[in-house]
């Protein structure tokens, strides 16, 4: 996404897969989704954000499949004329992806044991 002419702000959030350290057996996460359901939910979240803040453009990217520890997993970018709108929208969408988006992750362990939970 490029910063559209006339906008003053591009707020971004880049999230990596956290290395939990103490549990050295976890080597990656496998992230799953149902494409239609997830895309619909993300479009709805962007629509909600657009009614709250005046933004010009939004880019959401969330990786699917195997993602190794410390690799980027999510990118949220928001272009707006004012930084408050850009930062607030970026925070709202980041929180949505973490807490409400229909994504599931499974721990990938070196010992082949895995646990499935909401992303």
Model feature map: region roles:
Residues 1-73, 79-119:
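N-terminal, polar/charged subdomain of small-to-medium soluble alpha/beta proteins
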